[in-house]
Swiss-Prot record:
Species, as recorded: Bordetella parapertussis (strain 12822 / ATCC BAA-587 / NCTC 13253)
Keywords linked to the UniProt accession: Hydrolase, Metal-binding, Metalloprotease, Protease, Zinc
SUPFAM superfamilies: RuvA domain 2-like (SSF47781)
Entry protein name: UPF0758 protein BPP1850
Residues given in the record as Zn(2+) binding sites: 174, 176, 187
Domain MPN span(s) in chain numbering: 103-225
GO process terms (BP): proteolysis
Chain positions of motif JAMM motif: 174-187
Xref: NCBIfam families: PRK00024.1, radc
Alphabetical list of InterPro entries matching this protein: MPN, RadC_JAB, RuvA_2-like, UPF0758, UPF0758_N
Family: Belongs to the UPF0758 family.
GO molecular function, one term: metal ion binding
Amino acid sequence: MSLPEPLLRAGWPRERLLRHGAATLSDPELLALALRTGVAGCNAVQLGHDLLRRFGGLRGLLGTSPAELQVVPGLGTAKACVLAAVLELARRTLEEDLVRQDALANPDLVRRYCQAALGHRKVEHCIALYLDARLKLIICAEVARGTLTQAQIYPREIVREALRHHAAALILAHNHPGGTAAASAADIAMTRQIRQALALVDVRLIDHVIVAGAATVSMAAQGHL
């Protein structure tokens, strides 16, 4: 049930957060606190509901640009920027964990990071997580962006960036918008080509994660590397 604007202005979600913790609030209520006020004919909690519905939940909101958010009627630049900043902070918490932890020992963390980075994308993107000798994240970089069904990946560019960042290993990830997370024959062939190119400069390809919405698949776990 959504709250009337006067009750929201009185701080009901805020008071509950202070007394019982943020975990007691629903997703729309948490968004309402970031938005602070609603728009014409829609209080802040209702606006939170609308955002989640329009973008397919928190996963869909993650990584949404201010311009995309402003498509929502009444959502101006200020609200869109605040919301985009909050969502980007959420994404960066996963990146911070990868900087501190061994990626090989934390496959679930890697999959969650890749899903957060790619699960909401409408066209194919490929990213590379460049890792140091302790398998901690140095940097995550986009290496390809394509269409709904494909992204052109150049192994030489991935190798060049690995050398530039002094990486000892890396993890690739790409998304299948609107499809399944299963590796295609082309995915397998390209992955093996990249692995061979990296091996020439003593850089190890640890995994290639495929993302389709909320689903992720490890090509290493499936024996495709």
